[in-house]
Amino acid sequence: MASQGTKRSYEQMETDGERQNATEIRASVGKMIGGIGRFYIQMCTELKLNDYEGRLIQNSLTIERMVLSAFDERRNKYLEEHPSAGKDPKKTGGPIYKRVDGKWMRXLVLYDKEEIRRIWRQANNGDDATAGLTHIMIWHSNLNDTTYQRTRALVRTGMDPRMCSLMQGSTLPRRSGAAGAAVKGVGTMVLELIRMIKRGINDRNFWRGENGRKTRIAYERMCNILKGKFQTAAQRAMMDQVRESRNPGNAEIEDLTFLARSALILRGSVAHKSCLPACVYGPAVASGYDFEKEGYSLVGIDPFKLLQTSQVYSLIRPNENPAHKSQLVWMACNSAAFEDLRVSSFIRGTKVIPRGKLSTRGVQIASNENMDTMVSSTLELRSRYWAIRTRSGGNTNQQRASAGQISIQPTFSVQRNLPFDKTTIMAAFTGNAEGRTSDMRAEIIKMMESARPEEVSFQGRGVFEFSDERAANPIVPSFDMSNEGSYFFGDNAEEYDN
């Protein structure tokens, strides 16, 4: 599974395609984006939203959540079998914000899921268009990655909270398919596997019977996905062992935790995709842009170009800084939550600051928040340069880094040294070296210890001017390496825990 995944480009994963050439890929991704845009326009008509309200990111999130909920088969089935008071399993909805007499008002809307599915299919030439749904999921996941630091989830499974740079995609639903698996970080995969093993330890029947067989297949598939993210033979060999274990238990949990730590230096390859909110695609389609004809790529200049000309608004709470809210959404749109802040700042053309220094909470507004004090403001989502999104983890390099987040996961293919604090990481490896995998562990530790600054910096293309659409003239920025580059360094970003 993973080996196929590495040979198909993201766009093919994104569109469930077989091997296609570049033009076909651009067209099928464009078709997917156009479908999301058409759906959004139709929903704005249904909800009687004016142009400004349709460009409000909070309205976009509600509409996106409605369509994801309408197509969530497993949950829909569950809701019908376990009716809960006050929840109609056949309906979906959420808060929609409108301007009334110069004030923002919140109203809850409710729609039949069947109706939403009909509108979605109609916008997608009658198809279910699962690729478009996954695309929306990845956008929500990128927004969560940028907004919340997943320390609690890490601590619960016995991992170090400073490993948050491995946690990309940790809030993606299981049903997000190959495109979703491609953007999950090493830590996310490890966390999912540990949760599974823990269930097996606590529940005797987890691996048994017909259901157990399916569970086992899922377990092995997840192991293969994770194996495919590692770039060294020793890490992959350890994954084979975890996968082949007859009865996964604490030994496997230890191995997985060890592998997650090793990924701080011997980084895994994790894909990055620029997935934008539906309220960006809608107006572009409405203005007559034909995504399918023009073609579109999630990893090239296209999302940057789209953001240069898009007007997106957001509700702002009384003590929030609109510029900070813009940074949050900019990072989410570019999938840059775990990128080095210096690289992001250079590309964006304005300083990108750490999460703990941002005066902004999440983009979504809770139902009990007071609307009287809400204002709206334009999100500044433009960039100075554009860069290609990478899926290589690069190698890391011994520089001074924060005592907080160790290391980063590159988003952009831009050459630089990757800062991290090696002593902090190596300290995590003292102690437990026994167990069946001791020789592999020794080999991995040796590779990490010998990681040398000069051989292991991240090799990338560089950034490009917007006029350079073919990426012919890379500009390689030089960065002040004395500075810290991580976004979450042990600060007090909110948790993502519903």
UniProtKB/Swiss-Prot annotation:
Region (Disordered): 1-21
Subcellular location: Virion; Host nucleus
Post-translational modification: Late in virus-infected cells, may be cleaved from a 56-kDa protein to a 53-kDa protein by a cellular caspase. This cleavage might be a marker for the onset of apoptosis in infected cells or have a specific function in virus host interaction.
GO biological process: symbiont entry into host cell; viral penetration into host nucleus
Superkingdom of this protein's organism: Viruses
Motif Bipartite nuclear localization signal, residue range(s) on this chain: 198-216
GO molecular function annotation: RNA binding; structural molecule activity
Ribonucleoprotein among keywords: yes
GO cellular component, one term: host cell
Keywords for this protein: Capsid protein, Helical capsid protein, Host nucleus, Host-virus interaction, Ribonucleoprotein, RNA-binding, Viral nucleoprotein, Viral penetration into host nucleus, Virion, Virus entry into host cell
Annotated TM spans: none
Short sequence motif named Unconventional nuclear localization signal, residue ranges: 1-18
Basic and acidic residues: compositionally biased ranges: 8-21
Family: Belongs to the influenza viruses nucleoprotein family.
Function: Encapsidates the negative strand viral RNA, protecting it from nucleases. The encapsidated genomic RNA is termed the ribonucleoprotein (RNP) and serves as template for transcription and replication. The RNP needs to be localized in the host nucleus to start an infectious cycle, but is too large to diffuse through the nuclear pore complex. NP comprises at least 2 nuclear localization signals that are responsible for the active RNP import into the nucleus through cellular importin alpha/beta pathway.
Quaternary structure (record): Homomultimerizes to form the nucleocapsid. May bind host exportin-1/XPO1. Binds to viral genomic RNA. Protein-RNA contacts are mediated by a combination of electrostatic interactions between positively charged residues and the phosphate backbone and planar interactions between aromatic side chains and bases.
Name listed for the protein in its UniProt record: Nucleoprotein
